[in-house]
């Protein structure tokens, strides 16, 4: 547990602190880590100044000190001033001073968002069901209410229980100027707890961009994703931790996620037609003309409203009576909303059209890639997987009738040994083009 740093301290002079330090037999102050700690904890400039921020996982200076600075995070300039201050005590070992800073910071750790949430007191007025209509003109219905509640509770749980499973993205869909990004920025309470800097998931520094943030906006990222990148986005959302180094540390370590992800888009067809399901993405249409107020009309009032929004969500969280998923009754509404925003599946249409005219008994994914989709190159694994999803989902939904996956691999003259699909009832044509293979050949 962190030590409280708000206790009243008796101001001590440099001479007072020197009396507290261990010394050699000749009276010279020992240059030990413990003496450094004693100075950091009792010097009137440095006492209570150094704390470990559990959100950013960086060391902060949280009070006014005797030099000009901006921001809270400890930086190189701060270190120079601290070293100079330590010289008043005859201590100049930078390595030991740095070690002492880490120890003192760790013993005085804090979490700014937890402190914020735990300090809220709800006034009893329900706002979760109303907020998206109030600021953004969303429908005021049960679906919108559940979508907002799931997102808020997921965000709370992520900071109170870092690394918890939460892979849902609330996606606001509407034209420019509605205030979608501004809503998420103000929802994050402080600007430093919000980020819209996540542009690419293959960036080597992508995980550092999560550090210290609570709500991260992914603007138009889903709308511009192809079949391969949407799988990467889904995999990224499902992660519960990252492994990387933070400043001042030598070794990489697991970092449990404390953030949630929000989507914003102007496109009505932003969702890919994902055969494996789009359960991670919760679309909510918004319309500025239907909003009661614009969120920036009176920013102070909007921020007060949002404080009470979080207070209401904390009351629900503390009750334990919630789930981070749609109720069974709302699952159909979710799927209906997702259908409204799905892209036209051109590949599925081309494959369906090909099968209508196709007279063979069997077909494989590589054949469909070449003959139905008109490609001449060798397909990547994700491309054949997408074709398999089109076929298997189409068969299970009844969109593709008269076909079933064959149980064993077959040899296709142009495409080698492949798993694929066969007609349930053969039209008595094309069977001579394929041959059964043995189990040994299929391996």
Task: For the regions a language model picked out, list residue spans one by one.
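Residue-level preference for alpha-helix termini and adjacent loops
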Residues: 45, 49-54, 58-61, 66, ...
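P-loop NTPase catalytic core of nucleic-acid-dependent motor ATPases
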Residues: 101-211, 366, 373
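Extended aliphatic helical segments
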Residues: 5, 14-17, 39, 45, ...
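N-terminal nucleic-acid engagement/recognition segments and initiation subdomains in replication
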Residues: 1-127, 142, 146, 377-382, ...
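Generic detector of short, locally flexible boundary/turn motifs and exposed helical patches
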Residues: 79-83, 134-138, 179-185, 199-200, ...
């Amino acid at each position: 547990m962190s030590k409280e740093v708000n206790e009243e301290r008796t101001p001590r002079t440099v001479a007072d602190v020197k009396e507290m330090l261990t010394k050699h037999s000749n009276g010279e102050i020992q240059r030990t880590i413990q003496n450094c700690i004693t100075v950091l904890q009792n010097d009137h400039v440095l006492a209570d100044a150094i704390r470990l921020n559990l959100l950013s996982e960086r060391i902060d200076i949280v009070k006014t000190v005797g030099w000009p600075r901006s921001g809270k995070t400890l930086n190189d300039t701060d270190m120079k001033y601290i070293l100079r201050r330590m010289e008043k005590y005859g201590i100049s070992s930078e390595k030991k001073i740095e070690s002492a800073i880490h120890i003192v910071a760790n013993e005085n750790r804090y979490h700014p968002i937890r402190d914020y949430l735990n300090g809220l007191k709800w006034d009893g007025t329900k706002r979760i069901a109303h907020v998206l209509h109030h600021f953004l003109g969303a429908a005021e219905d049960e679906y919108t209410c559940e979508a907002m509640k799931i997102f808020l509770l997921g965000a709370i749980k992520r900071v109170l229980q870092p690394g918890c499973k939460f892979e849902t993205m609330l996606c606001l869909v509407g034209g420019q100027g509605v205030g979608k990004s501004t809503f998420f920025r103000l929802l994050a309470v402080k600007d430093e707890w919000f980020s819209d800097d996540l542009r690419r998931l293959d960036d080597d520094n992508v995980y550092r961009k999560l550090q210290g943030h609570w709500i991260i906006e992914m603007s138009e990222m889903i709308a511009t994703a192809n079949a391969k990148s949407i799988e990467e986005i889904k995999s990224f959302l499902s992660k519960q931790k990252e492994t990387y180094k933070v400043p001042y540390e030598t070794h990489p370590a697991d970092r449990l996620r404390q953030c949630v992800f929000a989507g914003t888009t102007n496109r009505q067809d932003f969702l890919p037609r994902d055969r494996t399901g789009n359960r991670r993405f919760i679309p909510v249409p918004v319309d500025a003309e239907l909003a009661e107020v614009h969120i920036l009309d009176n920013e102070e009032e909007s921020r007060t409203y949002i404080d009470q929004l979080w207070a209401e969500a904390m009351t629900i969280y503390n009750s334990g009576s919630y789930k981070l998923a749609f109720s069974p009754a709302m699952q159909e509404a979710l799927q209906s909303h997702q259908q409204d925003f799905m892209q036209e599946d051109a590949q599925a249409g081309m494959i369906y059209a090909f099968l209508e005219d196709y007279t063979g008994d069997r077909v494989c994914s590589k054949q469909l890639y070449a003959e139905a989709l008109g490609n001449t190159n060798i397909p990547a694994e994700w491309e054949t997987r997408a074709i398999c999803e089109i076929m298997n989902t189409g068969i299970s939904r009844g969109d593709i009738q008269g076909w079933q996956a064959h149980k064993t691999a077959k040899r296709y003259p142009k495409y080698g040994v492949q798993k694929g699909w066969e007609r349930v009832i053969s039209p008595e044509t094309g069977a001579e083009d394929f041959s059964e293979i043995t189990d040994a050949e299929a391996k």
